[in-house]
């Protein structure tokens, strides 16, 4: 392929392959990955289909995604050890110590490598969206990542397995996508585009009140015959498809009319979706297309009357076929697009509200009193008080002067004062880990960032395997560079969300894992029966998620409501050095109570747990450690 750089590192892409039915490759994560390879015309990876168990007799794919892609089959037992510890899809760089795992991470990497191989393909890089953040955040944080990576593929797979003996219901994930497509678009140049749309509507004779009425029904985007629709829809389409062409029209130098310039933001018409996330074709559309296609094939074949329940999804499916190269890529992957009947919605046919309704407790809790003191008093009445376990060795420290320079956090591009505090934090964690570690143990540094904890542990514990897990690619690359300088051979680097690490380990460690990430680390350790040493951070970001609920322990659940627990979390964040001493003291006490809840929850799972203050306490405003050992 033209423009390929000969110096590109050889990488191996591993995809699950269970079976292929009617052109649909299962699991759908594999279908999505192969579709992206075809769309990008990417040939820089050696692709392996990982067969279930020890299977070897499964026939190869009928539709190879690209002529230059080399595809082989492999059993799970033949996978490199680092890949065996991860969920697929996964990409590994030689010498098999740097792995990227999880659908979103792998797809973003394919896009970046395709662009590196041929920098003339700037439209490929545009798939990552504004500021290159499309599907970058983990599913726990981003609704779009959760929808594209988890809920839609899983929902469609389950739907395709149904026998339809009983009238089926449309999967909630599809209805959630329909709801998102009905929401106004938010883009970085939102105000400018909405003013352009106002100008278009005026030129078409559509008044503001009529325009607002029309936006209540998103089905009007589908080329209905009503006056002004084609004009109002043309702005979004023009902006969307201009991103997909090489030559863009120059911006107009004429000043906008006064009614456009002076219009209030509240009077501007909203922007409608052209593609999944808004106006621009992104990786989210690539992920959704194979899933929605196979879903619609079944719907049209057996349940065509159900199409009226998701007209915006159907319109998106037809619109996406107009994107350059989508037809070619789909054909190479065995996707034969189907024609859908024209659908319309009325203002009375709005997508259902799928937002979780607040619980009765959250809506009406007459006993709730704001502020930390009433909550702390309530706990004290139940015998729950601020209590720290003594530090087992407060004066212990690494001999930093004798360690190689690359081991020190000073190599991580930080000020000398901050580097000193980071060394003090590491002294605490390293002592706790080395006190428990045995030769041959696996130690996982979750949310590893630049690898400050993991690199020190790998250096001082050469007989242990250390695994760094981090979602941010640049942080992990910096950590690998430091590791290479030290010549460490007992360290792995995994770019993934922590739930995609499925390997066994003996000790889990996390320094300043943000918000619920600390709880996810502890949960991971509880399931694996591994010891843990965590230092929580960002208490103010703690909230209920799809996987974690607060309070966590039965003791705290019987005493505090969710709101009261959130009060503790909010005030636990108020420990900055510039705050008044009394306020910091209350913050420290709230930190302890939040962490005691975490500790008691772990004890309920058969662990011995302590909440300990780091020494010296000045090493960080967030200086609690939660140390747990399975009993």
UniProtKB/Swiss-Prot annotation:
Which residues belong to any copy of the GST C-terminal domain? 128-330
Q: Please identify the protein, giving its name as recorded.
A: Glutathione S-transferase C-terminal domain-containing protein
Question: One Pfam family name from the record?
Answer: Methyltransf_32
Q: Any idea which residues bear Phosphoserine here?
A: 231
Give the family this protein belongs to, as stated in its UniProt record. Answer: Belongs to the GSTCD family.
Native organism is Bos taurus (Bovine)
Taxonomy of origin reads:
Eukaryota, Metazoa, Chordata, Craniata, Vertebrata
Listed Basic and acidic residues bias regions: 211-224
Print the keywords alphabetically: Cytoplasm, Phosphoprotein
The UniProt entry, under InterPro entries, shows: Glutathione-S-Trfase_C_sf (IPR036282), Methyltranfer_dom (IPR025714), SAM-dependent_MTases_sf (IPR029063)
Where it sits in the cell: the answer is: Cytoplasm
Q: Which domain of life is it from?
A: Eukaryota
Q: Where is this region: Disordered?
A: 188-233, 345-373
């Amino acid at each position: 392929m033209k423009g390929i750089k000969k110096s590109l590192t050889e990488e191996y892409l591993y995809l699950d392959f269970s079976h292929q039915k009617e052109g649909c490759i299962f699991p759908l994560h594999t279908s999505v990955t192969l579709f992206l390879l075809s769309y990008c015309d990417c040939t820089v990876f050696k692709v392996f289909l990982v067969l279930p168990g020890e299977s070897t007799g499964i026939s190869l794919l009928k539709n190879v995604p690209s002529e230059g892609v080399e595809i082989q089959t492999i059993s799970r037992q033949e996978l490199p050890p680092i890949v065996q510890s991860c969920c697929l899809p996964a990409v590994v760089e030689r010498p098999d110590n740097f792995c990227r795992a999880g659908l979103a991470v792998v797809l973003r990497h394919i896009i970046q490598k395709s662009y590196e191989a041929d920098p003339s393909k700037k439209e490929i890089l545009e798939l990552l969206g504004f500021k290159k953040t499309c599907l970058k955040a983990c599913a726990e944080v981003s609704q779009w990542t959760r929808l594209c990576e988890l809920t839609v593929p899983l929902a469609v797979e389950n739907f395709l397995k149904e026998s339809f003996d009983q009238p089926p219901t449309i999967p909630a994930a599809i209805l959630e996508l329909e709801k998102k497509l009905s929401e106004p678009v938010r883009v970085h140049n939102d105000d400018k585009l909405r003013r352009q749309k106002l100008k278009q509507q005026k030129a078409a004779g559509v008044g503001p009140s009529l325009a607002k009425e029309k936006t209540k029904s998103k089905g009007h985007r589908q080329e209905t015959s009503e006056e002004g629709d084609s004009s109002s829809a043309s702005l979004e389409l023009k902006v969307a498809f201009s991103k997909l062409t090489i030559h863009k029209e120059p911006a107009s130098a004429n000043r906008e009319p006064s009614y456009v310039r002076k219009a209030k933001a509240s009077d501007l018409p909203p922007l409608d979706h052209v593609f999944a996330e808004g106006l621009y074709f992104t990786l989210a559309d690539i992920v959704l297309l194979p899933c929605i296609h196979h879903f619609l094939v079944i719907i049209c074949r057996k349940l065509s009357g159900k199409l009226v329940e998701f007209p915006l999804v159907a319109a998106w499916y037809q619109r996406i076929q107009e994107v350059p190269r989508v037809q070619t890529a789909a054909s190479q992957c065995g996707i034969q697009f189907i024609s859908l009947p024209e659908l319309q919605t009325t203002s009375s046919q709005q997508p259902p509200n799928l937002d979780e309704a607040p619980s009765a407790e959250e809506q009406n809790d007459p006993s709730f009193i704001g502020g930390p003191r009433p909550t702390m008093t309530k706990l004290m009445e139940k015998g729950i008080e601020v209590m720290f376990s003594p530090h087992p060795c407060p004066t212990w420290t690494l001999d930093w002067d004798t360690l190689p320079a690359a081991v020190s956090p000073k190599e991580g591009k930080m000020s000398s004062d901050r580097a000193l505090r980071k060394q003090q934090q590491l002294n605490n964690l390293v002592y706790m880990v080395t006190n428990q570690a045995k030769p041959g143990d696996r130690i996982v540094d979750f949310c590893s960032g630049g690898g400050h904890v993991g690199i020190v542990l790998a250096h001082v514990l050469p007989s242990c395997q250390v695994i760094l897990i981090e979602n941010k690619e640049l942080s992990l690359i910096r950590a690998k560079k430091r590791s290479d300088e030290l010549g460490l051979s007992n360290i792995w680097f995994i770019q993934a969300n922590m739930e995609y690490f499925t390997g066994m380990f003996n000790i889990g460690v996390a320094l300043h894992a943000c918000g619920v990430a600390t709880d996810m680390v502890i949960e991971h350790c509880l399931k694996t029966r591994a010891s843990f040493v965590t230092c929580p951070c960002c208490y103010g970001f703690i909230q209920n998620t799809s996987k974690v609920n607060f309070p966590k322990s039965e003791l705290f659940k019987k005493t505090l409501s969710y709101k009261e627990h959130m009060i503790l979390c909010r005030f636990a964040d108020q420990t900055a050095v510039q705050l008044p001493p009394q306020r910091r003291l209350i913050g420290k006490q709230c930190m302890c109570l939040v962490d005691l809840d975490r500790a008691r929850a772990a004890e309920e799972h058969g662990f011995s747990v302590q909440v300990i203050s780091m020494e010296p306490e000045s090493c960080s405003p967030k200086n609690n450690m939660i140390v747990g050992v399975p009993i």
